[in-house]
Amino acid sequence: VVVVAAVAVGVWWLWPKPLDTSHTKVEISASSKFKTAQLDDLVQASYRANAGMKNCSVDKVKYDERQSEDIVDMEIDSYDEGHGSALGRAVREHGRDGAAVLFVDMTCQEHVDDEDHVEWYMLLPQDDGTKTWVLQDWGNG
């Protein structure tokens, strides 16, 4: 019985656990671009984008509009200079009104390079007339 219990605990400990968002600190600045509900949806889009990160927890998600706009400007410049920015391309195709940069801090059971990273999103129209956040790219910004 003790051996079975030890094996069960070992399997539970090693079994990949889903992304934990139960203790996430969410920091959203005042926004002139997006409604509160849209920014709430942005946070949920990030959780969905990171759902594959097993044995990780999201410690903080931050949207700072001024910082986001500065990065959008840099990504547009990078794209215009031929450096292949996914966000810059999306902004040139759809306009900058839907562009947002989100900062995500994570802790994982085993260290991964992408624990703390930046995600670039566009709020894009869908066939049914709604708008949905679409991840354009991410990196260790």
Annotate each predicted stretch with a short phrase.
Residues 1-10:
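Hydrophobic membrane-insertion alpha-helices, especially the h-region
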Residues 3-4, 75-83, 122, 134-138:
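Short N-terminal secondary-structure initiator segments
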Residues 8, 93-96, 127, 137-139:
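Intrinsically disordered, low-complexity segments enriched in small/polar residues
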Residues 11-116:
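Flexible low-complexity loop/turn motifs enriched in small/helix-breaking residues
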Residues 117-141:
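Short beta-strand edge/turn micro-motifs at domain boundaries
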